[in-house]
A protein has these predicted regions:
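Divalent metal-coordination and catalytic microenvironments
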Residues: 7, 22, 27-28, 50, ...
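His/Asp/Glu-enriched, well-ordered alpha-helical/loop segment
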Residues: 200-228, 275, 296-303, 308-383
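C-terminal cap of metal-dependent C-N hydrolases
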Residues: 7, 318-321, 375-422
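Acidic (Asp/Glu)-rich catalytic clusters
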Residues: 109-115, 138-143
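A glycine-rich helix N-cap at a beta->alpha junction
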Residues: 111-126
């Protein structure tokens, strides 16, 4: 048994905050929540020391590079990074080598995921080989445990095929997640078109229209099909406006935003270079503030890291030749706490709703409230403790947040009966 004492429970499922102890049975199920619980004989006792005990973070968008590129990350190091960052559940993208578009490859990831303490779910590809030509076998993959489908990393440009995918997903009541970047508007990826960084690095960049056009199209398709759809890592003010209008029209649409798009702008690319190169790129301060407003009014309902590890030599190149993407699992809580809570934009409860409850609800992971009878998925953290990241559990260190003063330290996560301390 595990007894967590002297914690301040912050529960986004009930909207309550209270000082309580939590007793977790050997089966990983919460047995009791009370103001004071005496330790049963033989129980492991963890003193939270007045820190927050909240529901574990859920990241619906990570890349563990497993199979195929395990020099960057694998299920084991990715899970360690997730736990260090406060995440108890993550959803891996399908753009591995080979693509997760078959039951066999899905089983490979599931077998490795069964060996780590956090919940690692594996989404499957919408199209075979991410080629945008033929739909995968949704039915067989869903039956084998795929929680949803995505061609993340590439845009599904064929509108008719996208429509058919939504119909199939709706019939199975599983979600789809879309990487919305029309390549016709991307002359060079990873930097905002027309920005000072694009000029400095001598590249034309990626236009916001690449994202906005695809979102507009897929809102219409989602409205017609009734499919549950998420727009991944949105980056522009107009995208927020389009999604807001789509929600008003009744479409079952959802939106992710990354910690880096909430805290950085195109100007930061000048300082951090390739460690601030990602798809979609960082945009203007106006876009950043629109993303925050979208979070505040619920238009954007999920914060997701798009954790994208790359080897040092893949980033240590001229900007135009470097890989896009940054790591995010270990820094996400601190970055969001600093940029959103400490900056006065969101409450702690609102941040936990966006980083824990809403992502879990999108994948229908069930009731994760901190209450007797529910499986324990917890994060223990100090919101106000300063922290500077210099070392990582991830195999990769491609992040602009190294050495940056932040607030918010994760001390431990609990997944079922397992306590993982930092």
């Amino acid at each position: 048994m595990l007894l967590i004492q002297n914690g301040v429970i912050l529960d986004p499922y009930t909207g309550t905050e209270q000082v309580s102890d939590i007793l977790i049975g050997d089966d990983g199920i919460i047995a009791e929540v009370a103001a004071h619980i005496d330790a049963p004989q033989g129980a492991q006792v963890y003193d939270a020391c007045g820190r927050t005990v909240t529901t574990g973070l859920v990241d619906v968008h990570v890349h563990f590079r497993d199979p195929g590129q395990t020099h960057k990350e694998d299920v084991f190091t990715g899970a360690a990074a997730a736990a260090a960052g406060g995440f108890t559940t993550v959803v891996c993208m399908a753009n591995t080598i080979p693509t997760v578009d078959s039951v066999g490859t899905l089983r490979y990831v599931q077998e490795r995921a069964a060996q780590v303490p956090v919940n690692v779910l594996q989404a499957c590809a919408i199209t075979c080989g991410l080629k945008g030509k033929e739909l995968t076998d949704f039915e067989a993959l869903h039956a084998a445990g795929a929680p949803g489908f995505t061609d993340d990393g590439v845009n599904l440009t064929d509108a008719k095929l996208c429509y058919e995918a939504m119909l199939r997903a709706k019939a199975l009541e599983v979600p789809l997640s879309f990487h919305e970047e029309d390549p016709k508007f991307i002359l060079s990826p990873g930097v905002n078109a027309g920005s000072m960084a694009a000029i400095q690095f001598g590249v034309p960049g990626a236009m916001p229209s690449s994202e906005e056009c695809m979102i507009a199209r897929d809102i219409a398709l989602a409205q017609r099909t009734g499919a549950r759809v998420a727009f991944q890592h949105i980056s522009s003010a107009l995208s927020v406006d389009l999604i807001r209008k789509g929600r008003e029209l009744g479409a079952d649409i959802h939106a992710e935003v990354t910690p880096h798009h909430l805290s950085l702008t195109e100007l930061d690319v000048l300082e951090h270079g390739t460690n601030a190169r990602m798809n979609p790129p960082l945009r203007t301060e106006r876009d950043r503030m629109a993303l925050i407003e979208g979070l505040k009014d619920g238009t954007i309902d999920m914060i997701a890291t798009d954790h994208a590890p790359h080897a040092t030599e893949e980033k240590d190149r001229p900007f135009a030749k470097a890989m896009s993407g940054i790591t995010g699992l270990e820094t996400a809580f601190s970055v969001c706490n600093t940029a959103l809570v400490h900056a006065g934009h969101l409450s702690r409860m609102e941040l936990m709703t966006a980083m824990s409850k809403n992502p879990a609800d999108f994948y229908r992971l069930g009731d994760r409230a901190i209450a007797p009878g529910n499986r324990a998925e917890l994060m223990i953290a100090d919101w106000d403790e300063p922290i500077v990241y210099t070392e990582y559990k991830s195999k990769s260190t491609n992040t602009p947040f190294t050495g940056k003063p932040l607030f918010g330290r994760v001390y431990a996560v609990v997944v079922g009966e397992t306590l993982v301390e930092n």
